[in-house]
From Swiss-Prot:
Family annotation (InterPro entries): 4_helix_cytokine-like_core, EPO/TPO_CS, EPO_TPO, Erythroptn
Name of the coding gene: EPO
Localization terms from the record: Secreted
Similarity comment text for this entry: Belongs to the EPO/TPO family.
Biological function: Hormone involved in the regulation of erythrocyte proliferation and differentiation and the maintenance of a physiological level of circulating erythrocyte mass. Binds to EPOR leading to EPOR dimerization and JAK2 activation thereby activating specific downstream effectors, including STAT1 and STAT3.
Molecular-function annotations in GO: cytokine activity; erythropoietin receptor binding; hormone activity; protein kinase activator activity
Alphabetic keyword roster: Disulfide bond, Erythrocyte maturation, Glycoprotein, Hormone, Secreted, Signal
Signal peptide, first to last residue: 1-28
This protein's name: Erythropoietin
Sites where a glycan is attached: N52, N66, N111
Pfam family, one: EPO_TPO
Disulfide pairings: C35-C190, C57-C61
Keyword Signal: yes
Domain of life: Eukaryota
Amino acid sequence: MGVRGRLALLPLALLCLLVLALGLPVLGAPARLICDSRVLERYILEAKEAENVTMGCAEGCSLGENITVPDTKVNFHHWKKSEAGRHAVEVWQGLALLSEAMLRSQALLANSSQLPETLQVHVDKAVSGLRSLTSLLRALGVQKEAVSPPEAASSAAPLRTVAADTLCKLFRIYSNFLRGKLKLYTGEACRRGDR
């Protein structure tokens, strides 16, 4: 191949290098994104704002039915002694249950003309936020870590749940879950650095 042929390939080679160099940091970004405390804090702030808005509505903005949500209480002594896989299961199942609860409340609100539109906006934001958090945790590897061997699954305690019958209680639980179990788990997973 002559000099002209090599020069013709140079722009193509430079383009390939540029695409490769720009693509590599992006591939690793999602796993680290949840490790940036500002990301989780943004979701916590949105949940807290929604909780504050619903505190002001009459009778806590009744949902008209009980919706099952994860219990957000954390026994720190027990949490420190248990394995990361168990934490992953608790967080993954809790997030799935919260997502179902928010989707259910979204459906209930769609059928109600009595509640202000601002409440619908907060529920919609929560649904979107939970989807984003699920994606971020999936990139961190929580879903894989939450899948445990059969012998571990039989000894694992079932997820503790409570019922929420108002939007206020639902958003309080959502906020507490993010500030509690989710923040604890992501902090540990990011410190381990094995992701």
